[in-house]
Amino acid sequence: MPTPAVRFERVSKRYGEVAAVDDISLDVEPRAFVALVGRSGSGKSTLLKTVNRLVEPSAGRVLLDGEDVAAGPAPMLRRRIGYVFQHVGLFPHMTVAENIAIGPRIAGSPPPDMARLLDLVELPRAFAARRPAELSGGQRQRVGIARALAPGAKLMLMDEAFGALDPVTRDALGRRLRDLHDELGLTTILVTHDMAEALLLATRVAVMEEGRIVADETPAALLAGAGGEAAQALVAVPRDQARRLAGL
C-alpha cells in the first residue's frame, strides 16, 4: 500500500465545549479526489484547515506524505500545498502575474512559467499584465488556482472555492479543476455544500455530521443507496431537483 498523501489520525478540534471536529481518522491516497460534504457547521472547513495548519488540532495529528505537518514551520509546510478559498484574496495592487508568482518569490525559488500556468487555467496570456479589479469573479478564481499551482504543489485544498460563482462559471471551473487534477497527478480535497458537484468531481465523498465522518463512499455507491441516512439526505437534493425540473 502506498503511503497516504494525507492521513488524519484521531484528529479533534474543540472550541470550548463544542467539538468542531471529533476524533476523525481518514486516509487520502495519492491522486485521490476527495470531497468533504455536509450541512453548514458540520466541520468540513475546520478539518481541511488542519492540513495546512490554519487550524491546529486539539488532539490527534495530520500526516502529509507520512510526515507530521506540525514537525516544521507552518510557512514551509504551506509552500507544499495549494490552497484556494471562496474569496481568493488576490493583492489588488499587483498584476495577475505578480499574484501568481508571489509564492515562489517569497520562497526564493525561480519564477514560475507564467505562460504555462495561464494556459492551465484557460486564461489568455495577455491577462498577466491585468490587475484583479479588471477580472470577473471566475477569472479571479482561475488566477487563484494558478497561484496555488505555481510552487509545484501536488496537494490541492479547495475550500468552497466556487461558492460565490454563477452556475455556468462554477460548472466550467469544476470541470477544469478535475481535468487539472488528472493531467497533473494531483491529490485534491474539496469542501463543498453542493452534493451534485461532489458526485460529479470526486473519486470519494466523505460526509460529515456534527464533527464526524459518517460516510465515506464512491459517488457510484452513494447513488446506489450506500452511506446511511445523512448521506442519502444529501444525495436526495439533486435528485429531487432533477425530478422537479423534468416535471416542468
Predicted regions and their residues:
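ABC ATPase NBD coupling module
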Residues: 68-82, 106-108, 132, 222-226
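Conserved ABC ATPase "signature" C-loop
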Residues: 210-211
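Conserved ABC ATPase "signature" region
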Residues: 111-126, 179
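A short, proline-enriched helix->beta-strand linker immediately N-terminal to the Walker B motif
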Residues: 150-154
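ABC ATPase C-loop
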Residues: 127, 148-149
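ABC ATPase "signature
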Residues: 216-217, 225
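Helix-to-loop junction immediately C-terminal to a conserved catalytic motif
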Residues: 52
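Conserved ABC ATPase signature
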Residues: 131-135, 139-141
